[in-house]
Amino acid sequence: MVQSAPASEIAALILRGFDDYREQFREITDGARARFEQAQWQEAQRASTQRINLYEEKVAETVAGLRVGLADSELLDVERWPIIKSAYIAQIDLRLDDELAETWFNSIFCGLFSHDNISDGTMFVHTTRPSLRAHARAPYTRTYRPGGDLRQALEKIFDDYRFDVPYDDRERDLERIDALLHSNLPDWVCKDPDLAIELIGSVFYRNKGAYLVGRLFTPDEQWPLVFPLLHREGHGIQFDTVITDEAEVSIIFSFTRSYFMVDVPVPAELVAFLKRLLPGKHLAELYTSIGFYKQGKSEFYRALINHLATTDDRFVMAPGVRGMVMSVFTLPGFNTVFKIIKDRFNPSKSVDHATVIQKYQLVKNHDRVGRLADTQQFADFRFPVSKFEPECLAELLEVAPSTVVMEGDVVLIRHCWTERRMTPLNIYLENASEAQTREALNDYGLAIKQLAAANIFPGDMLLKNFGVTRHGRVVFYDYDEICYLTEVNFRYIPEPRFPEDEMSSEPWYSVGPNDVFPEEFPRFLFVDLNQRRLFAKLHGNLYDAKYWQGLQEQIREGKVIDVFPYRRQETPEQLLG
């Protein structure tokens, strides 16, 4: 029944919806340990998708409940919302996840009002929380002090983090991890009587792996520390390796990875701890990496508006070949690209606007195996005209007039995606040395293979559609033709019927909409003959339809293929049942 309600009651209803979301988020997350112990890999993938979709589902549910229970005159009077916001601040003040609660409030407000009502008076454009309140106390961690006996500390770690499934070979792993630490670190570190190991109490789960995350430190220095664990079905839990290199740990927390499942009692504390381990990571990326992608979006937006307010940076078109479906622009001093859908596509493209949006959602929900860039979707961005280079603004208005609109001295962008900026692979190769070319082309082939192992076919595999990250990894970022590998029909080109067939400009065989002929890849992918020959040596099996058909068969049999986010001795394409 629609009834009158004070601001505090509306705030309480919003917070009740948040509590429901957080409870279900924790429930899904808490199941990660059992899924790991029971080797339920497909269930883990489903849980990941379920948790991603949960936020929008619960926002919609809360908005619908407010509309049913409250009169429009109360709920949709925007002038009341500063009072509702004040009441809400009082109610979340003692919470341990208050920054997430602020973002939830913003989502509810945007579900009720158009974006032109957004202001810091009606919602949390800027946070009211103290900056990284986590400085008040340390996150839940376990600390070990080897006192010169690293092996004994490792034994205690193995005991403290044991699972309900036994270790495959505890002694073997202890010896190997001890040896790796002595190999990775300066000799004096392992002997330092003041050396300490600090590990986050909660285990990080993702796909088929579990990770212990923390640091090694002395009074003067620190190193990040990650122990990846695997469950070898039929054998037990295995400490796979140890990682102490900041760049390698950064890759594990990369924007190209799926989100971790980890118990996070106080999000700000955990993010502050991770920030100390990985100072090059932005808060947005760290929040996103542990599953709070909406909080990551809030942190990104705040960083963006602060950058625009404090610098003379102006939007320009992104370097590289212009896209047939998307138009891409960037801020030179802000490590992000902004992607909008063009009003009209190149005639060779068979997709429409709705299909493009579906493709981006597919990427959001799917295991990105370190080879697909994560994106954030935004609606109704407003920027001053003065923040655009004239050539950039003119091009955007020309190619996407339904999306980019002038409102006086403000540019309205109705819909866009943001994505980490990378160097397009084709541009990278233009300036690469022989060794860099070989490494990049090898990683390009691995990217295609690892995506295929995750049941993803990029569609358009041209070099320009892949980027190179600051760590030198090759990542796919053009999603308008992406699809599930199992939807593709990989074929061999039939033998010509007559000699004249090979000279014809038209194929002598029928071609279905999902047909792909890997034999055609070399001439489509590489203009440079040296690159073409090198890639054939590195990944020539990609030109064979049988290779792709074999992967499809394994995927249809329900096999989940290992793709590791760190270097190891075994092949990254190893199959496990």
From Swiss-Prot:
Catalytic activity entry:
L-seryl-[isocitrate dehydrogenase] + ATP = O-phospho-L-seryl-[isocitrate dehydrogenase] + ADP + H(+)
Q: InterPro entries this protein is in?
A: AceK_kinase, AceK_regulatory, Isocitrate_DH_AceK
Where are its TM segments located? none
Q: Which GO terms describe its biological process?
A: glucose metabolic process; glyoxylate cycle; tricarboxylic acid cycle
Principal localization reads cytoplasm
Q: Does the keyword Kinase apply?
A: yes
Signal sequence interval, chain numbering: none
Positions annotated as active site in the UniProt record: 374
UniProt-recorded name of the protein: Isocitrate dehydrogenase kinase/phosphatase
The organism's taxonomic lineage, starting at the top: Bacteria, Pseudomonadati, Pseudomonadota, Gammaproteobacteria, Pseudomonadales
| Gene designation per UniProt | aceK
